[in-house]
Regions:
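Transmembrane alpha-helices of multi-pass, membrane-embedded glycan-processing enzymes
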Residues: 77-88, 128-131, 279-282, 349, ...
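Periplasmic/ER-lumenal interhelical loops and adjacent helix-loop junctions
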Residues: 42-44, 50-55, 201-203, 207-290, ...
């Protein structure tokens, strides 16, 4: 082992930490990180923790926000995701005994379109994917070493993956089932198989027991109602997309197809002209890894099955070939429709590529034809994932730039503190997601998190052909007064708004001057009092 390999092996943790800092360096500025599915909550208290309905990951995040501030927690959380992704890949490739292969795997788990998109928009899914990858690491080590400690760690990672995003349960189930069944074919030990399934299932149940119990006892109705309200229309709205003129089959093979990519909400990996060359080279490495390890490697064969099934399910209803399978699952498997965004299955493709590719690197570097250039080729292989998703560096630098809440929002908050009301405060425009000028992008509306629990705000999806899943009486009453895009105009009896709101115990209306706020000009015509107005907000008193 030469000095370069010794350095890479000795300081791998520092190197992956440096990579994480490089990717996230813009977040070191002051402010909050506003993302599509990450509610910015600057004033978290114990009252914001719902012990019977929040996953342990959410409870932990809120406790951390109380201890070190939400802004600091955001940075640590993102840094931890990227760092642990790198370490997971490095550890996954440890059986290769090749440090270049380990770096290829670690960098690939960080630099790929799937993780990039989720870090940019849905960091909880990125964190859940990291937990899924660590589940694979510990499960494979357990099967190789038969040490219970490894199984306990695998069970914990399985539980965390589900806690971060509940429908990863299907991904966990597929990965675990296929790998354990392949192991049973070799071991022929039913007791070992049953013990493994039991421990992994127990890990999922224990780490999610509180919100699962809350759902069964009716204490977690919002989570349950959201899933119950999903329909086949949701599957069509969140269908996996063909990106950049490629077929949907190749798009998913290249770890893309997330609907957010189609909307150009962040820099695409395809903006880099070398992305496809790098991907095809890594595809060759993965293929070589499969070929060289097929006969002797249980994980290789198991991951081929996992990859094939996950690829089909990730494409889902976007393909006339695979649509019948997805539609059958939506109709017959409980809660599968909750996985309305099938592209999440791509996480398992990422895992498979990292594993196979690392073995491809190992055997490429063992080839006598490159004996005089082994170090150079090894570094080139390490760099391939970075070239593949090179746009991720600039993309995250742009997308994760922090922003401050406007001073006008703080003025409104001070007004509410000085003129408190016992009832509710309706926040308009009525959107769950809105293009907020101070956030610089379309994000989940942070009104309740900023102004307090009295706020009633939009819970409507408004994506594709899906407007909302809310069926409660309060929401339906409010939505009588909301003009819905792409729907026929109807006469709205605005004069009934004050008595309807009073019946809901709404005493103030707060209108943010963003998006379609001018569609709410009728508030000035129905005889309610305007008590505050600035450049960002208007507050009305009923």
């Amino acid at each position: 082992m030469d000095i370069v390999e010794q350095f890479l092996k000795k300081y791998y943790m520092a190197i992956f930490f440096a990579v994480a800092v490089l990717l996230l360096s813009p977040t070191l500025q002051a402010g909050y990180i506003f993302l599509l599915d990450w509610t910015v909550a600057p004033n978290v208290t114990l009252a914001d923790i719902h012990w019977g309905s929040d996953p342990v990951t959410t409870i932990g995040a809120r406790l951390a926000s109380m201890l070190i501030s939400f802004a600091v927690w955001q940075r640590l959380f993102l840094l931890g995701i990227v760092f642990l992704l790198g370490l997971a890949g490095f550890r996954l490739a440890r059986p290769t005994g090749n440090v270049y292969a380990q770096y290829f795997s670690g960098l690939f788990l960080i630099f790929n379109p799937f993780i990039y998109a989720r870090l940019a928009e849905q960091p909880g899914i990125a964190a859940g994917s990291a937990a899924l990858f660590w589940l694979a690491v510990y499960l494979l080590e357990y099967l190789a070493e038969v040490r219970m400690r490894k199984l306990f760690w695998a069970a914990g990672c399985a539980g965390l993956a589900v806690a971060f995003f509940p429908h990863s349960l299907f991904l966990v189930a597929l990965l675990v089932s296929v790998v354990l069944l392949f192991d049973y074919e070799r071991r022929r030990d039913l007791l070992f198989l049953g013990k493994s399934f039991f421990m992994l299932g127990a890990g999922v149940l224990l780490l999610n027991a509180n919100w699962l119990a809350g759902s069964f006892l009716g204490q977690n109705t919002s989570r349950a109602l959201a899933v119950v309200g999903f329909t086949a229309q949701d599957a069509q709205a969140f269908v996996t997309r063909a990106i950049g003129g490629d077929s949907v089959y190749f798009t998913v093979l290249a770890l893309q197809g997330y609907w957010g990519e189609y909307q150009d909400r962040f820099i695409s990996v395809q903006d880099n002209p070398l992305w496809e060359v790098a991907f095809l080279l890594m595809l060759l490495l993965a293929g070589w890894g499969i070929g060289k390890t097929w006969k002797k490697s249980l994980p290789t064969r198991a991951l081929v099955v996992v990859f094939g099934l996950a690829w089909m399910l990730a494409i889902g209803v976007a393909s006339p070939i695979f649509a019948p399978l997805s539609l059958w699952l939506y109709g017959h498997v409980p809660f599968y429709l909750g996985l309305r965004e099938p592209q999440k299955w791509v996480a398992l493709l990422v895992l498979a590529y990292a594993y196979w590719g690392s073995w491809g690197v190992k055997y490429l570097l063992a080839w006598k034809g490159i004996a005089n250039h082994r170090k150079l080729v090894g570094i080139f292989c390490m760099a391939l994932p970075v070239v593949f998703s090179f746009a991720m560096i600039g993309g995250l630098h742009q997308h994760l730039a922090p922003h401050q809440f406007p001073a006008e929002w703080q003025v409104a908050k001070n007004y509410l503190a000085a003129n408190s009301v016992p009832g509710k405060i309706l926040f308009l425009p009525w959107h769950q997601y809105a293009e907020l000028d101070f956030a610089g992008k379309n994000v989940v509306v942070p009104a309740r998190a900023f102004f307090g629990p009295q706020i009633v705000q939009g819970n409507n999806t408004e994506f594709g052909g899906v407007y909302s899943h809310a069926l409660d009486a309060s929401t339906l009453t409010i939505e009588k007064y909301v003009s819905k895009k792409n729907q026929p105009a109807v006469r709205i009896a605005y004069e009934n708004f004050p008595p309807d709101m009073q019946a809901l115990d709404v005493q103030l209306v707060m209108l943010a001057k963003t998006e379609d706020w001018q569609d709410y000009a009728w508030l000035d015509r129905i005889g309610i009092e305007k008590v505050l107005e600035n450049d960002k907000l208007i507050i009305y008193k009923l």
